Amino acid sequence: MDWQGHNLHFSDHVIHYYGNGNVGKPALVFCHGFSDNGLCWHRVALRFTDQFDIYLLDARNHGQSSRGIASAQDMTQDLADVITALELEPVIAVGHSMGAGTVAALAADYPHLVAKMILEDPAWSDEDDTQKTKSMRKRAAGFAKYLEMIARLSDDQLLAMGRAQHPSWSLEDFPSWVQSKREVDGFALKGLIRSPWQTLIENITCPALLLYADETSDGIVQQNVVDQILSLNPCFQCKQITGAGHNLRREQFEAYITAIEAFLN
């Protein structure tokens, strides 16, 4: 499918998104993780294209959206502004990692904009403030080195690296993954710092599905965090995807789709 690309112009920035033009159907909005882009949802979105009006957003400093300093709060505001400008509310919002944090913040701060949400392994842990600061600095430094490294690779080299690192992924996932790595800006690192997730959880009132990985994998959300979420907010359902790491949908695609379909139905 050829997704239709569009730009939304705001006062000082542009947000790019892709859609299927299925106006009149319920809106399903996807928010990607750090260094990905909207098209990285292509394979999942195809499974829902007949039932929904789909929007694949490029976050600021990713894809074809604007470059420049943008905080996590700015990205939440961007998502709210897009939904409002296109008169989509209330939407079903899906997010992975960084995008999951954006979706959760949207549901907490703008409850009227979100009917349901699905979060794929957000960056939520039970570290204390000191540990979180250290972890964030370590992650930011690691991401910065990663961006420098991939900038030196050709597309063929980047594809070979991706396939070697992620042998369980479908070949369909790699074209958008390679493209996204050419479209991420260093300013994107500023969007990774967000308020404590516990505060967000307490303010969420819509039905929510959290999908998390095996504890032995590279997933971020651990069982103790899941237990805290369920104790803090009865709106949440939490499901572990067996055999998956942080990129749940790419590693256990059918199980991921089945979980979403069950939640939406």
Regions found by a protein language model. Give the residues of each.
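Conserved HGGG/HGGXW glycine-rich cap/lid loop of the alpha/beta-hydrolase fold
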Residues: 13-64
